[in-house]
Amino acid sequence: QAGEVTGGQRAAATPPRRPALPIGDVDGERASSRSTGVGELDRVLGGGIVPGAVILLAGEPGVGKSTLLLDVAAKAARTAASSGRGPVLYVTGEESAAQVRGRAERIGALEPNLLIADETELGIVLGHVEASAPSLLIVDSVQTISSAQVEGGAGGVAQVRAVAASLIRVA
């Protein structure tokens, strides 16, 4: 039966704008992807990062997510510079810019087209995005960013949802 109970009221069914199609009839045009420079990650992502995509990388603490992201950021920055695209912006809410630079030195990831910002306020992060027009934005980690317009602390469900939604909109 159409509709579901939400807040004690039944939602009304709305006529679809276009009919549902058999999957084989859907245009198979594949969005172009950009290599991350890390072969195994490209394989997992189906060829690389699709422009406008939002990817959430999750894992246990200490498994190397931040190091992997920094490596990807440096390789993407190098590629972006050579192809005339904007810089890569790496926003860290977990470490200072100096700590990220230290790791970048250790893994050979110092690239002039790689910008680092250590911020935890969403408005400031969005200001960095607007000012730098990055070809790739990496946020490490979304749960450390908070919005002044949303109640609760960074990492809470409402904050993570609002921050993620804002970042998706700028993607």
Residues covered by each model-derived region:
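Detector for small/aliphatic-rich hydrophobic stretches
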Residues: 1-55, 67, 74-79, 83-90
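Conserved inter-motif catalytic segment of the P-loop NTP-binding fold
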Residues: 52, 60-63, 67-72, 76-169
